[in-house]
Amino acid sequence: MVFSYTEKKRIRKDFGKRPQVLDIPYLLSIQLGSFQKFVKKDPEGQNGLESAFRSVFPIKSYNGNAELRYLDYKLGEPVFDVKECQIRGMTFAAPLRVQLCLVIYERDGSAYNTIKRTQQQEVYMGEIPLMTDNGTFIINGIERVVVSQLHRSPGVFFDSDKGKTHSSGKILYTARIIPYRGSWLDFEFDLKDNLFVRIDRRRKLPVTVLLRALDYTNDQILNTFFNTVVYEFKDDLLFMNLVPERLRGETVSFDIKANDIIYVERGRRITSKHINKLKADNIIKVEVPLNYLMGKVIIKDYLDIKNGELIVAANTEISMDILHNLVKSGFNIIETLFSNDLDYGNYISETLRIDSTVTRFDALVEIYRVMRPGEPPTKEAAEYLFESLFFLEERYDLSDVGRMKFNRSLQRDDISGSGVLTKNDIIDVIKKLIDIRNGKGDVDDIDHLGNRRIRSVGEMAENQFRIGLVRVERAVKERLSLGDLDVLTPQDLINAKPISAAVREFFNSSQLSQFMDQNNPLSEITHKRRISALGPGGLTRERAGFEVRDVHPTHYGRVCPIETPEGPNIGLINSLSVYARTNKYGFLETPYRRVCDGKVSNDIHYLSAIEEGDFIIAQANTNLNKDGQFIDDLITCRNKGESGLFRKDQIDYMDVSTQQIVSVAASLIPFLEHDDANRALMGANMQRQAVPVIRSEKPLVGTGMERSVAVDSGVTVVAKRGGMVKYVDASRIVIHVNVNEISVEEAGIDIYNLKKYVRSNQNTCINQRPCVELGELIKKGDVIADGPSTDLGELALGQNMRIAFMPWNGYNFEDSMLVSERVVQEDRFTSIHIQELSCISRDTKLGPEEITSDIPNIGETALSKLDEVGVVYIGAEVVGGDILVGKITPKGETQLTPEEKLLRAIFGEKASDVKDSSLRVPNGICGTVIDVQIFTRDGIKKDKRALNIELTKLNQIKKDLGEELKIFESALFDRVYALLISSGVKKESLLDMNRCAWLNLKLKDITKQNQLLQLSHQYLDLKRIFEEKISIQYQKITQGDELAPGILKVVKVYLAVKRQIQPGDKMAGRHGNKGVISKINPVEDMPYDEYGVPVDIVLNPLGVPSRMNIGQILETHLGMAAKGIGDQINLMLQQHQEINKLRKFIQKAYKLGVGVRQNIDLNTFSDLEVLRLAKNLKSGMPIATPVFDGATEQEIKELLQLSGLPTSGQITLFDGCTGEVFERKVTVGYMYMLKLNHLVDDKMHARSTGSYSLVTQQPLGGKAQFGGQRFGEMEVWALEAYGASYTLQEMLTVKSDDVNGRTKMYKNIIDGNHMMEPGMPESFNVLLKEIRSLAINIELDD
């Protein structure tokens, strides 16, 4: 196996047996790919901005004398980069400029045909937020994610109510045509089997109204939907043209005979035998009695041959009179429609009878009345409305997806076609619905992933942009009609505000544009891969039923069956499976290996849920021989959503990987296959809540996915190109790029600036640390710096803790955990949290607020941490209530008493007209100030502190850019030096000269002289770029800030809070095994083993059997084995044993296992590399046990044996308090524990006095409102149950919300009089007012 430089430092032993056929794809491609489609120019105009422009332009004026054409668009460069936008609270966006052409026409006869004038102009159309490299958006300085939506695909869907609508249990069938844009069209049967249509879920109409509006007459309608039965009078006898198949299942009321042969006797039911006999004898006509014709329905209008009068209208039931009239008028052949009760219902015929419309105009008016109730219909308005509903491209669009789904549903050969509906489309849908009602065909499964598609960020942004463009279109049309065309320019016509507003509205306030979950790298990556069924055009929590939320067979390999939130959103918010991707139509696809004649190839095919239904697919854990052929004859496979046994020659495809069905978070749970699904769900969700700790530690037992997640999440720094580490410190890494990766015009230096102590969205700390050393050689793609929760380029959410499963004095009751004091001392779970506190200075009606250190009635001590401007120093340690930014607000003059006037006159005290509104540290928080940012409105003089901060920033930038320039110069002059030496210039003479003079030397060799000239130009360019960068940065830093109206100054103070683990904090493993810390126990009291090594955490063994998450036990055993191997290596290192011995032992550990795919040959490693590997393994050999393909029980035992530990995984423990041995052996091992972001510090809260609710006069609730306790309903019940009436009266009055009573009580207590006078509680007044609001007056007698 080939390892990268970083991987070689610490190789994870992989227990996976199945070959890795397909690498894990880039995990953020769903976000980046979709947005790329949106901003990238599409020459065909199918996607993105190009598609939106082409769909709206050209915009023509109402009278056709002018039009505005679209030519091209261009996205500019953003003014501020991502980091600057976050600091300044701005949106990371690029300006959109569009090339438009205004064409003015001249009247040529009756129409405008001749072009009079054209004018091209570039027009600004607002800003488009850009996606960062990690798939996020910076909106108003906040990092947000746009979640993909799983919505009902456009197309046609056939469904039924499953008999739930009516008490009779009759199944009513419906069809619904859903466009991508436009009106919905529903067809539905009622209880009487009449067929109705609804447009946009309005009042229903008989379906024949729609058909009549489509210009169908009664007989055309009947002929379209029914077969014809022809009856003929011959010699006073009535004959029927026979189609034998139609008689199946009928009981005949007469003998069917021909040529004197009786084929079916009267009263017999016609079977296949009779039909075959009739067909065999080629019987095409049979005699029928006259009464057989009674009640049959005529299929066409019969007109009098002489005068054209209507004798019988189509859809009339035949009676003797009608028959007599027809025969009398010379009609010997009578055509009726064919129907029966079994499989040819006469639904359309019955519907025609309840249809009151006669002409097309009647039908159009009826539709107009439904769509526009109250408006008087005219012929033109009714026609235009109907036309625009389904047949105009501007108003209706099925989209490519919709047309494809529509045509597939109707079994058409061609899957492409028009975006609008045609007559045939509507007719075919009605025909299929009638067929389903007749028992031919099935309804669709709406939860099938072939009927639900993914709408990603690019598509949603495009739709929103189109909405903005449509708003602009209306304004442009009006301006073209009203304005003076000779002076109008495209710039005058376009107002960018509606477009900006539409885009801003989407990114700021859409339900799918969400505040990014930035707890740790996994929560980031999961949030970006999330798929929501909620949001605009989707479902709502309240209306979503069980079926939509449930796992569907088509989710296999596309959507994770495990990871979904608990609570009201369960099943509505899902996560994308590891290998899933979307196809061009937006449907989810998953990869499979092609199987040919029982042999599995490495040919990968991606199949959507629709395509997958046709194939038989084997699972990834199916046994194969070396040639890739199936070993077993009968193999468990999936076909059409069901599992079954199939012969190996029947199989079409095989799964790519065992982890194909789960999401990223679920694939990080080792031994997932041994956990109950409910607990696995909790485990997957809780990993996302893990807080990054100060020192991340890789999991001893992992799944092999850790590296992919860490790299793809973007929190680590990955080398763009290979090379040698030239410089490294805590905040910067410089790499000298390999010669073969350098282009001619550049210096060949890559500089990586690391993030230091940045606040995340969840107030956790983002800090990057280099993991390379000076002089190391690295390759492209190597991890060169770790971020939060990563360790040597692997995801590290928690810590490996030595745990024991045993009860301990009741401290692990109900999932509690007993934790050793050593864990706290070693800072294993200590995390840093960064709080941002803002102080805003506004311009008020009474005058501007002022940020100052001169605050009235505040002592010197309280101001000791502020500078002269009134802003806290960096490095100050502050606690709750401390002033961070001093601020005074003007207040209105109050009427002064004579005494106050006298005092003011004597002492000249003027401070009373301002009040203290300083920013203070919230209660319960204590930390260190790590940064202060000051933003001042443009045009307002900056204070001393703001200028100092500016100066510091400028100096830092000059220093950084100067160092960058130095590095680039050094690299460039190295190349110049090499060139001059190779040209024969002496080394001594070069060293005596100034380096810049080297560039002016003249060389004999013309080629080398040209190269020197090129390097000289590069040097000048470097200098110029450096100067430009400094001037741009200077301008950015010194310019005023764009603040909201009325805001003069904003001061942001950043506090770093260090949180150690303490009782009340929530911790969890990866298997849904969560609990709260009950006690931090002294290390000497913890249970210890025979070597005196204490355990770190004691867990309750009763937490395992009922929860059925046995994965945690296996993880504990394997963790113990991994640590044992590390201990053995550590011992060898301490004894300074020779490298070969070390190499052999490590090689033996890596080789262990049956049929594992990993093949590591340590003989290819140098001694230095083996030594470095051993040093990294001494804390434990990291192990990967992939989901559904992990380590077996036997392999765990073998590893335990190799590490010299008992294979039972249990050891003898001693009580730390008494020193006595415990009665039986205890399961001890290493489990990866996470500290979750549910810290007791954030939840604990105390109050003595505080704010009250204005209405009820009771304390507010919750920590955020600094709330208190109220004596609530249930507490009242408790006192009532005890009959404690005096206590109850006291609680409900003076101790609660009797305002006067509690004031009197306070005075009485001060006076030493312990009497109480209960009054009227405020909540009783609320009740009285509620009752009065119902117009019932209640008055109380005194």
From Swiss-Prot:
One of its GO terms (biological process) is DNA-templated transcription. Its EC number is 2.7.7.6. Keywords: DNA-directed RNA polymerase, Nucleotidyltransferase, Transcription, Transferase. The keyword Transcription applies. GO terms for molecular function: DNA binding; DNA-directed RNA polymerase activity; ribonucleoside binding. It catalyses: RNA(n) + a ribonucleoside 5'-triphosphate = RNA(n+1) + diphosphate. PANTHER family: DNA-DIRECTED RNA POLYMERASE I SUBUNIT 2 (PTHR20856). DNA-dependent RNA polymerase catalyzes the transcription of DNA into RNA using the four ribonucleoside triphosphates as substrates. Belongs to the RNA polymerase beta chain family. This is DNA-directed RNA polymerase subunit beta. It comes from Blochmanniella floridana. The gene is rpoB.
